[in-house]
Amino acid sequence: AKEEVLIGGLTFLKNWIIRSETSEALDKLFVKNISTNIEEELIFSDETVYVPGVNLIQKDRNTDEVYLGYSSPKTPSRVFKYNLSNKSKELIKEQEIPSGHNKDDYIVERVEFKSHDGRLVPLTITRHKKTKINGSANVLLYGYGSYGNSMSPSFSSTRLSLINRDIIWATAHIRGGMEKGMKWWKEGKLTNKKNTFEDYIYAAKYLIEKNYTSKGNIIGMGGSAGGLLMGAVVNQSPELFLGIIM
């Protein structure tokens, strides 16, 4: 449903319209050829979870070339020069990780779990490929769920520092954000705010049920408005958590 899609922006060129949107907590880019009226999604790679972006080259709207940005939880930021007409791309810039980085060492999963009222909530899980899924790992579960802010699954070198130590990083795309459109935000604000808290608690329970971790081994994390979330969930379900960062 369109009410579960967030339009992030539109870029107009002489021959093309580029639309960015978010649905099911996944960021996407679509390109429409104005002369043929054909629209296609720009597919960056075989990764399911990533963050795309687009910028004009010298603000030239007569061009067929644009800069495309790309990153994912396991792939550092990259910038490509992309030709919309022949679909060729050239790598222009790539984020350097001084300590070295091999994206194949990491596994990124996108799952959904049922919350207290049956709504399906997206969850992004990033872990080292050597981390065992037997309930022994600690999980850092990040959440925000406020002001319609979506938690895009981008790259973070500091996050990988934890993941390299066998800590699983999970981001719960809970209600109050706009990962599933305007309705997702409205279902997590004002008198519906309890949905934000319940979504997060059910994310923790899902991670325990699926043996990513065990009860009492989850570190909850949320800052600013996410601090309200942390205060609520640790008081509602203290047995789930090893600690709270806020």
Which sequence ranges carry the predicted segments?
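Cap/lid segment of the alpha/beta-hydrolase catalytic domain
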Residues: 45, 69, 82-88, 92-219, ...
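Beta-strand C-termini and the immediately following turn/loop, strongest in propeller blades
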Residues: 18-25, 32-33, 67-73
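A short loop-to-beta-strand structural motif that recurs across blades of beta-propeller domains
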Residues: 28-30, 78-80
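Short flexible coil/turn linkers enriched for glycine and charged/polar residues
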Residues: 23-25, 60-62, 73-74, 117-120, ...
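Conserved beta-propeller blade repeats
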Residues: 2-20, 48-69, 109-110, 156-160, ...
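Multi-bladed beta-propeller domains
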Residues: 1-7, 11, 34-56, 85-105
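Conserved hydrolase catalytic core segment
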Residues: 232-243
